[in-house]
A protein has these predicted regions:
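A short beta-loop-alpha structural element at the N-terminal edge
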Residues: 2-16
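Short acidic (Asp/Glu) patches
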Residues: 66, 101, 105, 133-137
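A short, polar/charged loop-to-alpha-helix boundary motif
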Residues: 69-78
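A short, internal acetyl-CoA/4′-phosphopantetheine-binding micro-motif in the GNAT/acyltransferase core
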Residues: 85-93
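Conserved acetyl-CoA pyrophosphate-binding loop and the N-cap/start of the following alpha-helix
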Residues: 92, 96-104, 114
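Conserved active-site alpha-helix within GNAT-family acetyltransferase domains
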Residues: 111-115, 120-145
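C-terminal "cap" of GNAT-fold acetyltransferases
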Residues: 140-156
Length: 156
């Protein structure tokens, strides 16, 4: 098993893997592969936190991060991270690969000086990694909503 930074020549394989993993998962079809494609063009994309996982020379996992901000009610801004899509090929899910890839990426983020990650994700998938509901940190959307899927992890 190898974790390395994604390269341009990986993009198509990664997008096909994302499509396979998310197809018809929570709604008909999916758009996560297109989202990953677009994120790579964003000025907030962090190439140093764009990882693939290989097993026997085949890409089986992927995660990418973007810069984000939290705006406090007093106007102060905190620079944070968000990630997604986070994907493990369906044939390799529930075998510990996701945990290894996520932990590797979180350590790399911490090494770069980041201390907070905020994501939209299924709590059943992320609570075991230390992500907690946003309400615990008084982090909400602009309209004071605290969605269950808005989750926070402090990097310690």
């Amino acid at each position: 098993m190898l974790i390395r930074n994604e390269r341009f020549e990986d993009y198509r394989v990664v997008e096909e893997m994302i499509k396979k993993a998310f197809w018809n998962l929570s709604e008909p079809g999916c758009n996560e592969h297109y989202f990953a494609h677009q994120v790579r063009k964003s000025e907030d994309f962090i190439p140093e936190l764009d990882f693939v996982m290989e097993e026997d020379g085949q890409v089986i996992g992927h995660i990418l991060y973007v810069k984000a901000k939290l705006l406090a009610t007093d106007g102060t801004v905190k620079n944070i991270l968000s990630f997604g899509p986070f994907t493990i090929h369906p044939d390799y899910q529930r075998k510990g690969y996701g945990r290894k890839l996520l932990n590797h990426s979180l350590e790399a983020a911490k090494d770069m000086g980041y201390d907070t990650v905020v994501i939209f994700g299924n709590p059943e998938n992320y609570a075991c990694y230390g992500f907690k509901n946003c309400k615990r940190y008084n982090i909400c959307l602009e309209n004071n909503l605290y969605p269950v899927a808005l989750m926070v992890k402090e990097l310690e």
